[in-house]
Curated annotation (Swiss-Prot):
It catalyses: cytidine(1402) in 16S rRNA + S-adenosyl-L-methionine = 2'-O-methylcytidine(1402) in 16S rRNA + S-adenosyl-L-homocysteine + H(+). NCBIfam families: 16S rRNA (cytidine(1402)-2'-O)-methyltransferase. Catalyzes the 2'-O-methylation of the ribose of cytidine 1402 (C1402) in 16S rRNA. GO terms for cellular component: cytoplasm. This is Ribosomal RNA small subunit methyltransferase I. Keywords: Cytoplasm, Methyltransferase, rRNA processing, S-adenosyl-L-methionine, Transferase. It comes from Leptospira biflexa serovar Patoc (strain Patoc 1 / ATCC 23582 / Paris).
Length: 240
């Protein structure tokens, strides 16, 4: 279905997390036709647009942590301009600053339209084979080991899937915490999802992960199947 230009809308547009083929036709249509694209990094977004043949102007919202760009953007939206919000990769608002713009727009009466697509979170869930309800998403874990531990301790109270992102240089400090807090929990690791060196590896428990660590390069997402043994591997009763 072709994009129909409408005034005063903010489109929240997912972009690829690695494989350019994951951009949707609708996303391309929207990004070509809006008046302005709001982004994290102008450099990253312009690089994507060059590959897609998109010439729409871009504005980096968060470079100076100022509220001034937000005020200017809101004024233009209220005047009838249409805009799209993108992140550097994946779905805006999922472990990036995008939710701030969406919340501000909603508080000011701006209509918001999702244009869904790639996400490392849903990509790993889709290949897990685990019952996905409930899923507790932590985003990126904290930098400090003590705070990281507290976050995982709170998550341990949930019986279900626990999903989080982790930076490559923090992996050695992560493994001992997982071994202590989740000694019998299944682990699914996704590395460089949708990219050339993509890996999805299953570990029976965190000790197996620590003894056979993945290549310490790239971007990582982890899934812990933290539930009773009798529930592990069950299929969902609903599908969306």
């Amino acid at each position: 279905m072709a994009y129909k230009r409408e005034k005063g809308l903010l489109y929240v547009v997912a972009t690829p997390i690695g494989n350019m083929g994951d951009i949707t036709l609708r996303a391309i249509d929207v990004l070509k036709e809006v008046d302005l694209v709001l982004c994290e990094s102008a450099k990253e977004t312009k690089s994507l647009f060059h590959k897609l043949g998109i010439s729409t102007p871009v504005l980096a919202l968060y470079k100076d942590h100022s509220e001034t760009p937000f005020a200017n953007v809101l004024e233009q939206l209220k005047q009838g301009k249409s805009m799209a919000l993108v992140s550097d990769a994946g779905t805006p608002g999922v472990s990036d600053p995008g939710s701030q713009m969406v919340r501000t727009a909603r508080e000011n009466g701006i209509s918001i339209v999702p244009v869904p697509g790639a996400s490392a979170l849903t990509a790993l869930l889709s290949v897990s084979g685990f019952q996905v309800n409930p899923t507790y998403f932590l985003g990126f874990l904290s930098e400090k080991p003590s705070k990281k531990r507290r976050e995982l301790e709170r998550a341990r109270e949930i019986e279900g899937l626990i999903v989080f992102y982790e930076s490559v240089h923090k992996l050695p400090r992560l493994y001992p915490i997982l071994e202590e807090l989740f000694p019998e929990t299944e682990v699914l690791m996704g590395r460089e999802l949708t990219k050339a060196f993509e890996e999805v590896v299953y570990y029976a428990n965190p000790r197996e992960l620590a003894n056979n660590p993945p290549n310490a390069k790239g971007e990582f997402v982890f899934l812990l199947n933290h539930r009773k043994k009798s529930l592990k591997g069950n299929s969902d009763s609903t599908d969306m």
